[in-house]
Structure formats: C-alpha cells, structure tokens
Amino acid sequence: MTIAWVIALNKPFYPLYVWYLVGDGVTASLGSLIATPIFLAIPFIARRSSLAARLALPLVGTLDTLFETKLFGPDSGTELFFAACMLLVAVSFRAGERWWQRGAAVFVFVVFVFSRNWMGMPLYAWSSDDLSILLNLNAFAVASLTTFIALRYAGIVHATAPDAEDRR
C-alpha cells in the first residue's frame, strides 16, 4: 500500500478523533478533509509519471500541513507533519533526480518558515486544553506516519554514481 493511500484513508478519521478527544471544533476539523481527493489522485498520477507522483506527495503534504496549521494553529502540533514531508523528500527520489529533490526540500523548508512567522491567528479559536490534546494527537500521528515511511522505504538503495558535482 502506498503512503498516499495510507494518508487518504486515515484523513476521514481525524474529525472523529477531534470529536472524541476534544469535543469542540469538529466542524472546523472537517477542513482537514479538503486535501483527501488530491492524496487519492497521487497513486493514479504514478501510473503516468512516477517522478510526478514522488514530487506530488511531499508537496501536497506540505501544502496540506500549511492549511491545517492555519486551521488549528501552530500550538496544535500540525507543523510536525513538515518532518514527514521532509522525510519523504529525503527517501523518494532517485540519484538522477537530485535537483528535483533539492527543490522539493527547499520548498518544504520555505513553507515551514512561512508557517512559523506569517500565518497569523488560527481559523478556529482552540482552548489551551484543546491544543494540548491536539498536540498529543498530532505528535502520535506524525510518529506513526514517519515510522510507516521508514518501514516502506527500508532496504531501498538508490544507485549513485559519483559525478563531477559529488567530487567537489
């Protein structure tokens, strides 16, 4: 099962977790479902272009993380998902795709910096108790996702041939 499928299939449960654990903000948390169709499209994109799909997953994840950080606020821990996006960038590309990989890494980092400095107030006013619960939920979700990514890519070696750039 691809990472995109795992993300897409888990997204509908997030508002349920918010409802069960927090009680408030369920309607606001439905916004977390917006990117689900895009995550569902990534395996189909892969049929036409594996590079496009390998680019799409961390980039869509990054933009989804940015939106959810605006929705929930940085104190909710949603920014932790940037780490999963960067991990995807680190493991998803082949040796000949290093410039795509570098561009994706810079994109994830720039969006992260933007989220830390210029996001403003969250779209929903969460209490400090709610944010504490969301932080725990999101920390567990990120740990689970990064573990799944590591297990998925375990043992995959991307062939590298030294070139002039590597010898500098």
Please state what every model-predicted region is.
Residues 12-34, 95-156:
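Alpha-helical transmembrane segments and their interfaces in multipass membrane proteins
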Residues 89-95:
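Interfacial segments of multi-pass membrane proteins
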